[in-house]
A protein has these predicted regions:
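Anion-binding (especially nucleotide phosphate/pyrophosphate-binding) glycine-rich loop
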Residues: 5-136
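Phosphate/pyrophosphate- and phosphate-bearing ligand-binding catalytic cores of soluble enzymes
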Residues: 22-23, 74, 161-283, 287-288, ...
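Structural signature of FAD isoalloxazine-binding scaffolds in flavoprotein oxidoreductases
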Residues: 36-37, 42-48, 75-93, 141-172, ...
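Gly/Ser/Thr-rich helix-start
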Residues: 37-38, 70-72, 81-84, 109, ...
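Short, basic and Ser/Thr-rich N-terminal targeting/leader segments
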Residues: 61, 68-70, 154, 225-226, ...
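A generic local secondary-structure boundary/capping motif
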Residues: 73-74, 115-118, 126-130, 143-150, ...
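Core subunits and conserved enzymes of cellular information-processing
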Residues: 105, 130, 138-142, 147-148, ...
Length: 307
């Protein structure tokens, strides 16, 4: 669909729903890589009802949709995104205690705010996630993890909008949580809220562990440069960063993209990188590691648009 048509349809829908939107918006402002072309329109739903209405309007008018959270695990084409970007973020971020050990939150809440809420309520179980840059929905979608913990340990239920635009939920084993994967990775459903079961603990102990993990992140990861976190999934029996370093790729650059000199498992935007630079470097690293080690690395990063 032509950009003007897309913008006009989605804009009218957003205005009826009193939802924020941005026209011809640069995706570099909405991704942690700080790259990518423009989107025809970005709309910010603030409820399940508004999200469903936007999706319904786009479907009826054959408008392609892209669902994003904090944009911390995506690489957007330099050509931009033709269609509607639906950002589930701070407008979609209510949080509350369901009981003394259970948090229920909307999927757009940042992991930082979720972890802070757990700390405020002396709830342990999310210490591993302190410093993860994405949203709670994004973390559930990929079963995010670090430092011996993962969402699988605390996530007990997700509410979603399915491909027929009906509201439903998955619980327990239905969530299909495994390494960097969930049932939502493949089913096309959109997570709208999460239920997490945690444990009461000493607030100071929780805080100490959170900041210990944050310190490890700062020491070992190139947080001073734009990136999407760990670029590759850990291959069974190996560590991606070690394989890349053994292939002498630490510091290797294509355009403004570089394999981090601090941690080879991170591809970073060293300065003025394009998405094409980053995608080309990711491919080069994958092929080089495969040629030298016989292991094909699987990207954690999702690619949106045409590459």
């Amino acid at each position: 669909m032509k950009g003007d048509y897309v913008t006009d349809i989605v804009k009218k829908t957003a205005e009826k729903l009193n939802c924020r939107y941005l026209e011809n918006a640069s995706m570099r402002d909405f991704t942690s890589f700080k790259t990518g072309g423009n989107a025809d329109i970005i709309v910010f739903p603030d409820s399940i009802a508004s999200l469903t209405a936007i999706l319904k309007s786009c479907r009826e008018n054959e408008i392609k949709t892209y669902i994003i959270g904090n944009g911390s695990n995506i690489l957007v084409s330099d050509n931009g995104l033709f269609g509607a970007v639906i950002k589930i973020g701070s407008d979609f971020s209510n949080i509350e205690l369901a009981d003394e050990n259970t948090i229920v939150c909307e999927s757009g809440i940042s992991m930082a705010k979720l972890c802070s809420f757990a700390l405020e309520n002396s709830l342990s179980g999310l210490e591993f996630a302190f410093g993860i840059p994405g949203t709670a929905g994004g973390a559930a979608f990929m079963n995010a993890g670090a430092y011996g913990g993962e969402m699988k340990d605390v996530l007990v239920e997700c509410t979603h909008i399915d491909t027929d635009l009906n509201v439903g939920k998955l619980t327990g084993d239905e969530l299909g949580l495994s390494y960097r994967k969930s049932a939502y990775s493949d089913n096309g459903y959109i997570i709208t809220s999460l239920k997490l079961r945690l444990e009461k603990s000493d607030k100071e102990s929780i805080k100490a562990k959170m900041y210990e993990n944050l310190g490890k992140r700062k020491d070992k990861q190139p947080l001073e440069f734009p990136s999407a976190g760990s670029t590759f999934k850990r291959p069974e029996g190996y560590f991606a960063g070690a394989l890349i370093e053994e292939c002498a790729l630490k510091g290797y650059s294509i355009g403004g993209a570089q394999v981090s000199e601090k941690h080879a498992g991170f591809v970073i935007n060293k300065g003025n990188a394009t998405s094409t630079d980053i995608a080309t470097l990711i491919d080069y690293v994958r092929n080089t590691v495969y040629d030298n080690k016989g292991v094909m690395l699987d990207p954690e990063v999702r690619f949106l648009g045409e590459f």
